[in-house]
């Protein structure tokens, strides 16, 4: 199979996917190495295909951000140590919240944003396992723990309840500072 055919099939596969697809799975499906898939994704992005990488795999951007219009969407500003990240995510998910992303405002690079796509406890476990396995550091380590999350909730009252619970455990950054 030629590279252009593989990339066309890759876009079709991502278009049909309802969940993120890991590069290793795609590599196995197409009979190439993981690194070839990573390169294909880079080439497709340069060709104006909006593919995002989450900690769970690749996803087309329109699928990642398709949110029911009846749900409330807002941003929260948090500050915590790395060992409090699971508590933060658990509070949000236990209320029925969906953590779309994390953002930090780096003094040199400006806004750095990463897709999370965390909807349930299993996603939190996967995130935690991936961080442990890679010995990775939180993006917020660049900004003294300060970061933002875009979250989607069933309604505004749920969003406010999440904020109250995060504030109660000292994770929500005090808006009066």
Segments from the language model and where they lie:
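Solvent-exposed alpha-helical segments within well-ordered globular domains of core cellular machineries
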Residues: 8, 12, 39-42, 90, ...
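Minor-groove-contacting beta-hairpin "wing" of winged helix-turn-helix DNA-binding domains
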Residues: 51-62
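Conserved beta-strand edge residues that scaffold enzyme active sites
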Residues: 28, 58, 106-107
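N-terminal helix-turn-helix
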Residues: 20-53
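Basic helix-turn-helix/winged-helix DNA-binding cores
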Residues: 65-68
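Residue-level detector of family-conserved "landmark" positions at structurally sensitive sites
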Residues: 24, 54-55, 102, 176
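Extreme N-terminal segment that seeds HTH/winged-HTH DNA-binding domains in transcriptional regulators
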Residues: 1-28
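Mid-protein regulatory/catalytic core that forms ligand/cofactor-binding pockets
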Residues: 70-177
